[in-house]
UniProtKB/Swiss-Prot annotation:
Organism: Shewanella baltica (strain OS195)
Protein name: Adenosine deaminase
Stored InterPro entries: A_deaminase, A_deaminase_dom, Ado/ade_deaminase, Metal_Hydrolase
Family: Belongs to the metallo-dependent hydrolases superfamily. Adenosine and AMP deaminases family. Adenosine deaminase subfamily.
Cofactor binding, per record: Binds 1 zinc ion per subunit.
Any single GO BP term: purine ribonucleoside monophosphate biosynthetic process
Gene: add
Any one GO cellular component localisation term in the record: cytosol
Principal EC category: hydrolase
Catalytic residue positions: E200 (proton donor)
Record-listed substrate binding positions: H14, D16, G170, D279
Keywords annotated in UniProt: Hydrolase, Metal-binding, Nucleotide metabolism, Zinc
EC number(s) recorded for this UniProt protein: 3.5.4.4
UniProt cross-references to HAMAP family, sorted A to Z: A_deaminase
């Protein structure tokens, strides 16, 4: 199912959406933070999706618990370190970990630049102990408004040498992409790549805007592109990558069922698309789960799954030499 001769990657993976249950428990107790359960065993249902529970509100509430225990910069560094460990232990050869320093900082009023530095330090420490390649993507969380995103951008750009790209995430309907055109001009001026959450809650126009105005060369989720034939043609022609996260889309009610997921439609249209975990801590999944789902529920053949793996390597924010090195390590 997973082709071991091809690098296994996860490109849409939120660091702040992957905090271990035991880490939430330990940090909560360490910092005197009230948790919704009185034992480690009973905490899981409050911070991870259980069974077929699918609602965006329930999903986001679980995500809030993950950042709610980030009471100091040591906690941030620990979570970053554990993200590297989790990526390696799930069999990934390469992962791009994205994070919103404003979101991670806000509960306990941490310094945004300090959060970025703690993430960088935690990842560096993890890379000393685990054999996996990691790059970082900074997120601007649109839900908090333009001014907050300016603060976030400045904190991230202070450490731009440790980032490969910037992302726009959050409330796509309430805060459309055009509000952040100036922010992403600064991102382009900093020579960082751009991806954006688009076409998830809003329609295809949100994706057009992200590509044409923000400068996105990849789109997170993008499920609503399938209703716009011209956009589908454009995505295929210009090799705009779709970072697909089927289980997350189910958990947030972006799609009603796996059978309704448009992954197959993208593939048949020749669009560059890959598989990702999104918030693996909340969804309680790993990349292997997504490949199993792609085979059993999305009905992809082994040959198609191998193509999806190759797509991920092509889509990655890597140099050609780094891509070749990933393949060489699999021989």
């Amino acid at each position: 199912m997973i082709d071991t001769s091809i690098p296994l990657v996860d490109l849409h993976r939120h660091l702040d959406g992957n905090v271990r249950v035991n880490t939430i428990w330990e940090l909560g107790h360490q910092h005197g933070i009230a948790l919704p359960a009185d034992s480690l065993e009973t905490l899981a249902p409050f911070v991870q999706i259980q069974g077929k529970e699918t609602s965006l509100v329930a999903f986001l509430k679980k995500l809030d618990w993950m950042v709610g225990v980030l009471a100091d910069l040591d906690a941030v560094k620990r979570v970053a370190y554990e993200n590297v460990a989790d990526a390696a232990l799930s069999g990934l050869d390469y992962a791009e970990l994205r994070f919103s320093p404003y979101y991670m900082a806000m509960n306990h009023k941490l310094p945004i630049e300090g959060v970025v530095e703690a993430v960088v330090d935690g990842v560096k420490a993890g890379l000393k102990d685990y054999n996996v390649k990691i790059n970082l993507i900074g997120i601007l969380s649109r839900s908090f408004g333009q001014a907050a995103c300016t603060q976030e951008l400045e904190g991230l750009l202070t450490h731009k040498q440790h980032l490969v790209a910037m992302d726009l995430a959050g409330d796509e309907m309430g805060f459309p992409g055009e509000l952040f055109n100036e922010h992403f001009k600064r991102v382009r001026d900093a020579d960082l790549a751009i991806t954006a959450h688009a076409g998830e809650a809003a329609g295809s126009q949100s994706m057009w805007q992200a590509i044409q105005e923000l400068g996105a060369t990849r789109i997170g989720h993008g499920v609503n592109a399938i209703h716009d034939p011209k956009l589908m043609e454009y995505l295929a022609k210009h090799r705009i990558g779709i970072e697909s996260c089927p289980t997350s889309n189910l958990h947030t009610s972006t799609v009603a069922s796996y059978a309704d997921h448009p992954f197959r439609t993208f593939m048949d249209a020749g669009v560059l698309i890959n598989l990702n975990t999104d918030d693996p801590g909340v969804s309680a999944i790993d990349i292997n789960h997504e490949y199993r789902i792609a085979k059993s529920e999305l009905k992809l053949t082994d040959a198609e799954l191998a193509q999806v793996q190759r797509n991920g390597v092509e889509m990655a924010f890597l140099s050609d030499s780094e891509r070749k090195a990933l393949y060489a390590a699999k021989v």
